[in-house]
From Swiss-Prot:
The gene is pksD. Keywords: Acyltransferase, Antibiotic biosynthesis, Cytoplasm, Transferase. Probably involved in some intermediate steps for the synthesis of the antibiotic polyketide bacillaene which is involved in secondary metabolism. It comes from Bacillus subtilis (strain 168). The lineage of its organism: Bacteria, Bacillati, Bacillota, Bacilli, Bacillales. Its EC number is 2.3.1.-. This is Polyketide biosynthesis acyltransferase homolog PksD. One of its GO terms (cellular component) is cytoplasm.
Length: 324
């Protein structure tokens, strides 16, 4: 039996300027998908997401953290890459989303079409921008036991994910997170500030919940046609109601548990469709042994996506069937 193929979609913190640049220039399917969604977004917010992503005055290292651009940009990149793989005959047996990546997973699985999902993302960005104070997220490369060992240091933050045994993420007010970062660096503990302007998955975005819930009540969602394994629950979802699309960015992320669930069912192959390859890196830490042979990413900040795309042919099997 073939190893089931899992498409993974990451969320806020994985984005950067010029992501997917090679594909946008060289791949017709990717570019067409990006431009179609860009036109939809421009009608809603009055400006081009694509022009912001590929702004000639921006460097990859510049923070791409304006939610009105970054929220839709992540979805557009991930869904457009899915269309490229679909065009090559590479289809998923499962989709796995993490945080904002749950929206792309839902679109790919047929819960909603891409245009409607993009509308949900844009509305969420607008409401959060109008309702919430700014915040930050910090990735820490150490054991989560650190939180218990130094309770005073982490008192003004919220644990939002444990991605593997020595990698966890916290959210909080910007001043508090920056102070934690300084203290960790003094202790020679590696950490990285994520390129976000809001403290996703924490109580700091609660002021946006009511307005977004009201918006979601006008939407309808279908049963997934491809199994969804969610980082919200750490398991397989069979039905997605409107509350899911708020909880996906508010509740803690359980990506580690989602991977463990999949691996308890099958020996899987994984393709990271996010812009940074972050989820692929996590999988390689979570799965012992041959994980490097079972997991790959395509788009990375090193702009080798055309080369990486060719290697993904290894994941295509003629026997795999795909139905909607």
């Amino acid at each position: 039996m073939n190893e089931p193929l899992v498409f993974m979609f990451s969320g806020q913190g994985s984005q950067y300027y010029h992501m997917g640049k090679e594909l946008f220039k060289e791949n017709t399917v990717f570019r067409q998908s990006m431009l179609e969604m860009d036109a939809i977004a421009a009608r809603r917010i009055g400006t081009s997401i694509v022009e912001e992503i590929y702004h000639p005055g921006k460097r990859v290292s510049d923070p791409f953290d304006s939610i009105l651009f970054s929220h839709p940009a992540i979805f557009m990149i991930e869904y457009s890459l899915y269309k490229v793989l679909e065009d090559r005959g590479i289809y998923p047996d499962y989709v796995l989303g993490s945080s904002l990546g749950e929206f792309a997973a839902a679109a790919v699985s047929g819960v909603s079409d891409a245009e409607d999902m993009l509308d949900c993302i844009l509305e969420q960005a607008i409401i959060i921008q109008n309702s919430c104070d700014k915040g930050k997220m910090l990735a820490i490369l150490d054991k989560p036991q650190l939180l218990n060992d130094h309770p005073q240091l982490f008192g003004n933050s919220e644990l939002i994910s444990i991605n593997y045994d020595s990698h966890f993420v916290i959210s909080g007010e910007e001043d508090h997170i920056r102070k934690i970062m300084e203290d960790l660096k003094e202790k020679q503990i590696l950490c990285q500030l994520l390129p976000v302007s809001y403290a996703f998955h924490s109580s700091l975005i609660d002021p946006a919940e009511s307005a977004y819930a009201e918006f979601l009540r006008s939407k309808s969602f279908q049963k997934p046609s491809i199994p969804i394994v969610s980082s919200l629950t750490g398991s397989c979802l069979h039905v997605m109601d409107e509350n899911f699309f708020w909880n996906a960015v508010r509740k803690p992320m359980m990506f580690r548990e989602a991977i463990r669930y999949l691996e308890s069912q099958h020996t899987c192959k994984f393709i990271d469709l996010g812009p940074s390859g972050t989820l692929a890196a996590f999988v390689k830490q979570l799965i012992p042994g041959d994980s490097a042979d079972r997991c790959c990413s395509i788009i990375t900040p090193f702009h080798q996506e055309l080369k990486n795309l060719n290697t993904v042919e290894y994941f295509r099997t003629p026997e795999r069937k795909f139905t909607r």
